[in-house]
Amino acid sequence: MDKKNINNVKLGKDVKIFDFVNLYGCTIGDNTKVGTFVEIQKNAFIGRNCKISSHSFICEGVHIEDNVFVGHNVTFINDRIPRATNEDGGMQDESDW
């Protein structure tokens, strides 16, 4: 049984990824550690020498610089990039709210 869900991810050298993660479409820099039960979404960027502690959620578009520690159960939210669409299929923006 595969305990990691990793799809379309750019991994640097010596990256350590623990079990029960969901990583897709993101970039993770050299010597970074990703703990258990972490989700990192598409277009997120994690720098070099970082530690992403367990149960953390890093949403689309988040950019984490080098040498950053993200503590246990940290959640980044994304209220700048809307996920809803208009009737024509285009993305909603501030004027739609």
Predicted feature descriptions by range:
Residues 1-10, 19-97:
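Flexible, glycine/small-residue-enriched loop-and-beta-strand segment within the central core
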